[in-house]
């Protein structure tokens, strides 16, 4: 009861909860006022604004060393045309150049939804065994591609929707989240088509895929520290690898 009474009466406005990188990017593309002076009903904190600028700099969308540090770079202008999270947009731009758009659209849409793989507390071993067919020894990101291909093979040869749903549940997969993943992928496909970009017809290599991924995940890089099991990331952040990761 005490915990309930201490909770806020209303959820914080979205502008206060989400990354401001997208907001800053759109405002600059539309040549609106700087976010610091824009008359928001609930203005974001200075820390949140600084983090948003830092992410855009990390993605190469702005260049603080240029004559106009507040202006968008060519990469920034391209990102502003993609109505997705700037990190995902940066991966997609890099995938276009690395000729791995086919795989990246699958991965980017997967990262936009909750993981479709269920791992119930009372069926950890069984679910892990079922999901092992999608695993990739070199990359968890590529596991999404394997799962995607498996799922669409089942859809292609399904006898009925009811039987497909039953099969997915025996494999500890969420039919609803798989559908959501499919829908977002379709949206990204339409977006890429509007830009006139071509999907690669030959399978991309792990190197191509990961070079594209890294362009949007620079802040997530880390190296193994001297402390057993610990890694050191950007801004001296210490982190651990999830027990379920290989």
Pin down the residues of each PLM region.
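Second RecA-like catalytic domain
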Residues: 1-246
């Amino acid at each position: 009861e005490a915990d309930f009474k201490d909770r806020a009466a209303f959820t914080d406005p979205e502008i206060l909860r989400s990354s401001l990188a997208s907001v800053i990017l759109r405002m600059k593309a539309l040549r609106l006022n700087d976010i610091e002076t824009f008359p928001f009903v609930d203005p974001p904190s200075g820390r949140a604004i600084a983090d948003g600028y830092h992410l855009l700099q990390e993605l190469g969308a702005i260049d603080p060393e240029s004559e106009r540090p507040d202006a968008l770079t060519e990469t920034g202008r391209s990102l502003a045309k993609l109505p997705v999270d700037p990190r995902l947009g940066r991966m997609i731009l890099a995938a276009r150049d690395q000729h791995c758009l086919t795989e990246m659209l699958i991965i980017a849409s997967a990262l936009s939804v909750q993981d479709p793989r269920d791992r119930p507390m009372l069926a950890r071993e069984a679910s892990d065994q079922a999901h092992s067919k999608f695993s990739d020894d070199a990359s968890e990101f590529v596991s999404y591609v394997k799962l995607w291909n498996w799922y669409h093979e089942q859809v292609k040869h399904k006898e009925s929707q009811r039987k497909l749903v039953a099969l997915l549940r025996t494999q500890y997969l969420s039919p609803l989240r798989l559908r959501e993943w499919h829908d977002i992928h379709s949206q990204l496909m339409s977006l890429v088509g509007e830009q006139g970009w071509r999907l690669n017809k030959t399978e991309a290599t792990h190197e191509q895929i990961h070079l594209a991924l890294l362009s949007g995940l620079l802040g997530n890089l880390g190296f193994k520290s001297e402390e057993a099991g610990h890694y050191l990331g950007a801004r001296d952040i210490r982190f651990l690898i999830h027990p379920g990761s290989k």
